[in-house]
Amino acid sequence: MSSATRLSVIGAGAIGRTHIDRIRRHPDLTLVGIADPTPAAETLARSLGVPWFADHRQLLEQVKPAAAVVATPNATHIDVAADCLERGIATLVEKPVADSVSEAQRLVDCEARCQTPVLVGHHRRHNPINQRAKALIDEGRLGRVVSATALALFLKPDAYFDAAWRRQSGGGPVLINLIHDIDMLRFLVGDIVSVQALDSRAVRDFEVEDTAVAVLRFAQGALGTVSVSDATASPWCWDFCAGEQGQYPRQEVQSHFIAGTHGSLSLPDLALWNYRGQRSWHAEFTREQTMVHAADPYTCQLVHFAAVAERRVAPLCTALDGLRTLQATLAVHEAAMTGQAVDTSLPK
């Protein structure tokens, strides 16, 4: 970059503060403003020496950033993002992109109308591990992908549920956690056209699910299974295995598996399995270890976002991607409730 990209952050909760931290650490990014009506956000902005605004529209008008990160409550994402896009400001919208598919469609339409780019904050796409995994798949190293498996099994402590919304519909592990794994599989394998699912509340007996299992059909014919539970004493979870977030103990196990006609891949260790010669279950396997340079995916995402804002690259996760991931995730709830397969294919 010829000069530091001027970024603002709208919403200074937990994920907003993650973005603020990464922006301040990177020499090619400059934090030029924070918008959030809370006293804590004002205190944070003053401690960092950056302008603070209670109203994000004042920030956009007075600071005129090149790009804005929208990390407000989910229900406000689209209205805030629209305020940015209508001013020609490139926008990173945190996940989930919206509360509903119809709201997400508003963002897709607004982006097209304003001709201003949107990046949706599914940060795992930016992890070098997943970048390399996608390259291996796209190069044909696995042959035709046949099966994909994702495990998101972990244990949230009782205190986590002191906040009432976490015990209510929409606050469970499907929309909070599994959406990451669904987007990751969409990135690696392709679009999801059908979802079947079961869920359970058997452990905690809350209104919201504690466990869900879904079967996915991908557009290119592969099938997938995803399992999520926040009530299991288990190490099989991307957050534990990939080491993206320091607050979780690192576990040297794998959580995602992609199997094809010529080879299979485990993640996050990037072990590629294939046959030495004849392809048969009687033949010996070889295990090829692929290495990548570790990098913080949130930082990688912001660097990519700066390039998007400068119109140098296309968004790695578009507004339509955010919509399609949300649609597939909400379909897990619908399929579990109805007992029927949910069609998530694009209209003909």
Task: Give the label of every model feature segment.
Residues 205-209, 219-300:
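NAD(P)-dinucleotide binding in Rossmann-like oxidoreductases
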Residues 1, 67-69, 135, 267-268, ...:
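C-terminal helix-rich "cap/oligomerization" subdomain common to oxidoreductases
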Residues 43-50, 110-114:
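Short, conserved SAM-binding/catalytic segment
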Residues 117, 124-216, 339:
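Predominantly a Rossmann-like dinucleotide-binding segment in NAD(P)-dependent oxidoreductases
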Residues 54, 93, 118-120, 149, ...:
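Hydrophobic residues in well-ordered beta-strands that form the structural core
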Residues 19, 37, 50-110:
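Beta-loop-alpha module in the N-terminal Rossmann-like domain of NAD(P)-dependent dehydrogenases
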Residues 1-48:
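N-terminal Rossmann-like dinucleotide-binding module
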